[in-house]
Amino acid sequence: MSSNFLNPVTTQTWANGRHLVRCVKVIQETWDVRTFCFMADQPILFFFKPGQFVTLELEIDGEPVMRSYTISSSPSVPYSFSITIKRVPGGRVSNWLHDNLKEGQELPVHGPVGLFNAIDFPADKVLFLSGGVGITPVMSMARWFFDTNANVDMVFVHSARSPKDIIYHRELEHMASRIDNFSLHIICERHGLGEAWAGYRGYLNLRMLELIAPDFLEREIFCCGPTPYMSAVKHLLQGHGYDMSRYHEEAFGPTPPEVRADVRELAAEAAEAPEVPVADQHQVEFTATGKSIRVSPGETVHAAAAKLGLHIPKACGMGICGTCKVMKTAGEVEMEHNGGITDEDVAEGYILSCCSVPKGDVVIDY
């Protein structure tokens, strides 16, 4: 490593896009959770909003795979970033990462993106609610407030299956012991044989919440966890007068069944749809490859590329991860995304190909 590696004059700033990074450390957080730390060989300041995520570009068994993970570190430590991953039984990507990703290995990442963050929703009093590995985005937020000595009153409530499943336990206790504006509360569903636990047991309920944060109605809430956990939290808050415009969430887990059903239904409808007259079709041109194709109304730019054999990376297919971002140099599209692209990128001409439908002839630099 050269002596000027961390020279601010030569250091670049992380921009939303594709970057090659190297794994520099692997930390065993719990028996089934690991943190992977990354840096770039060419020094980059990894600036992001606490709570945002990146998408890893992997190759598993010779097949390209994209998967998104929240950044668990804080932008206050800018020369590296970390992601924390739970080994999921039967999970293709999480198991591969636990078994194969070692220090020194390089991989491309896309991002950072995400609307779930602590910067866009400033507040003097916050309540962090997390379940399982859903702790990662709110931990990034808490670390940011802690490191920057922010004048923010934080209540941090984490739910885990058992004491051995508590992620970042020692660090959380350290934070709570160092500053007065960080109140830590951990709820364990159960405890195993030989495990001592004097804290809250069971599941988060109204009585617990009122004991932990009597003023929860006055706080901005950031919540993340498995879908059942999120549903229970929302039901609890909605039933007791909380202003849900101050509630922010990020779900961890597989795509909900209703979303998968909608996608299958749309695919079936498209397959049965009659052929569209040429006059009603739009041309999509990809200038970098010199290819073009006419598409029917409703077809996305990504679908057009796929028909031409062009591989635009994609992970979520719902405008969330930002992986499929491309530059539009001409024409107009209708883009309905879910936070996977910034207003600045849109102003420059970028679109998310997975959720952008041409409104006329379109030219893409790809």
Curated annotation (Swiss-Prot):
Superkingdom in the source lineage: Bacteria
Residue ranges of domain 2Fe-2S ferredoxin-type in the record: 282-366
Reported consequences of knocking out the gene: Deletion of gbcA and gbcB abrogates the ability to grow on glycine betaine as a sole carbon source.
List of residues binding [2Fe-2S] cluster: 316, 321, 324, 354
Presence of keyword Oxidoreductase: yes
EC number assigned by the record: 1.14.13.251
Substrates-to-products reaction catalysed: glycine betaine + NADH + O2 + H(+) = N,N-dimethylglycine + formaldehyde + NAD(+) + H2O
Keyword annotations from UniProtKB, A to Z: 2Fe-2S, FAD, Flavoprotein, Iron, Iron-sulfur, Metal-binding, Monooxygenase, Oxidoreductase
Domain FAD-binding FR-type: 16-119
Molecular function via GO: 2 iron, 2 sulfur cluster binding; metal ion binding; monooxygenase activity; oxidoreductase activity
Cofactor binding description: Binds 1 FAD per subunit. Binds 1 2Fe-2S cluster per subunit.
Root EC class: oxidoreductase
Necessary cofactors: FAD; [2Fe-2S] cluster
CDD domains hit by this protein: fer2, FNR_iron_sulfur_binding_1
Any Pfam family the entry gives: Fer2
Family: In the N-terminal section; belongs to the FAD-binding oxidoreductase type 6 family.
The protein's assembly and partners: The system is composed of an oxygenase subunit (GbcA) and a reductase subunit (GbcB).
Annotated protein name in UniProt: Glycine betaine monooxygenase reductase subunit
Originating species: Pseudomonas aeruginosa (strain ATCC 15692 / DSM 22644 / CIP 104116 / JCM 14847 / LMG 12228 / 1C / PRS 101 / PAO1)
Gene name of this polypeptide: gbcB
